[in-house]
Amino acid sequence: MKRALLLTVCMAAIAAISQAQQTTVNVETAGTLSEQIGSDKYTITSLKITGNLNGTDFILLRDMAGIDLDNVPTEGKLATLDLSEAKVVAGGEAYYTDYVNNKEFYTNDNEMGNCIFYSCDKLESLSLPAGTTVVGDSAFMRCTALSEITLPDGLKEIRSYAFSETQIASFSFVNGIMPAKGMFRNCGKLTSVTLPEECEEIPANTFSGTAITEITLPKNLVKIGKEAFSSCMLTSLECPATLEEIDESAFFMCSSLASVSLNDGLQSIEGSAFSYCDKLETIEIPNSVTELEGCFSNCTALKSAVLPEGLTAIPDYMFDRCSNLESVNIPEGVKTIGDNAFQNNMRLLDVVFPEGLESIGENAFSSCYTMENINLPETVKTIGEGAFDGCEGVVVMSLPGSITTIPRNAFSYMVYLEELTIGEGTKTIDQMAFINCESLTKLTLPSTLESIGYAAFAYNMLTEVDCKAVTPPACDNTSFAGWDSDVPQDCLLYVPQGAKAEYEKADVWKEFIIKESETSGIESETAAGATETARYGIDGRKLAKPARGINIIRMSDGTARKVINR
């Protein structure tokens, strides 16, 4: 009996009672919680506190929930914490130290301050004080077991990363509270969210890495921030009429996103906004979009895309590695196609290049294996290295002379290319520009050509070269090199009348079988019985049928002749 009485007295002394494994403590004077918890701090699993709490008390609570003042894990087991009848007051010691930024955090009245339970990985359920008005930055970040939190009606603000890396499964924004940056970042169990109708912006990282499968965006939404939904489980997206901006990587790697409806009125889509959305099959970008960055790269299921009519530039990496893309429109006003814009679009058949196009970037159409036609307008002035490298489907190609320099690897590994005409105006063909065009048999070079670089036409099957330059272009013994010779064996070289002697003295060129062309530089005698095999316009473009003006006809015996159709 005496022992029982003594135990009752001791429990009264610490003002705590145990009911169904919950310990209840009243802290009349802030900063005295440790006196009442005593040696039980590592055994209590469920705790309710009434009274006043300051920074000193939260040092203990953090210790009980698994992390000490030096951010070292403890033996604490506190899983359930009810502070609904407690009050946070200013004062006491710093409850948390950010050693990276050398910053200490102290309590303020009615605030759950920055990092107040940061990394308390034992905490599973928490009820906040009824008077709480603010939840601070990273307040519960990395509370990796926290699945239930009760917020008071008077709460006015939740700040950035407050619940990041917790186990919260659902959340409704009420009482005017707005989403904050990184608020639920990497909350892998979060599946349901209700956003406030008055919300105008979803900040960066708000829902990245969550398990949300569907969400209704607010009718007043204006902006979706950087990585706002990246790596989440969304299956569809319907943008409200008010939306103006989708920021960088907003839906990056949403691997279940199969349907996207973009609104008229949308103005900008930033880089990688929908990259790696590998279930997305179609996309139509509204004409209201005026700012566009490379936002659909690695969408491997994407089959068709519609670009806005007012677009003047296709950005770098726009559809890079969209391996199933079959069709895309290039708007009439486009002047620039960026680097890697359509790289590795292995099913892209044909692209219509608009008049007015001026430049094509590096690797823009590299490894577009199924492209069959490359018809560039005379307005194109520059193309980047590797622009059409590996476009295996092209058989006949004519390039405009407006491209004064054909750069390195621009058309290399076009293994089925048989006939190539380079237009008047081109001066330089850089190294390896057409290397490994293994089926190339007929080549026409312009009178303006001055130099041919290292291995520019190496490893081909050339049987005929028609070079219209009076002065032999500079080249070296690799420019036309084959597997076992400097030039293709038994290859005919047609040169302008009067230029044969110069070519016979020129290194490399003298290895060809040299013949002078007719006066036109195009016509030659046609053998009896020879038939037409191909027809070209004066600009070098292949013709499907006779056209008015000068036609260049390729004959079955390897000769060419010029006719004028009136």
Model-identified regions with their sequence ranges:
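Structural signature of tandem-repeat unit edges
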Residues: 22-28, 45-53, 74-110, 121-134, ...
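Short, T/G/N/S-enriched strand-turn elements that build extracellular solenoid repeat scaffolds
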Residues: 31-40, 56-66, 70, 171, ...
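Bacterial Sec-dependent N-terminal signal peptides
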Residues: 1-22
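Residue-level detector of functionally pivotal "anchor" positions at catalytic/ligand-binding pockets or at interdomain
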Residues: 516-539
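Terminal processing/anchoring signals of secreted or surface-associated proteins
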Residues: 47, 503, 520-524, 540, ...
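Short, surface-exposed loop/turn motifs with a glycine/proline- and acidic-biased composition
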Residues: 537-559
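C-terminal tail/sorting-segment detector
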Residues: 1-3, 552-566
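Consensus positions within tandem repeat domains that build extended binding/scaffold surfaces
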Residues: 113-116, 136-141, 159-162, 181-183, ...
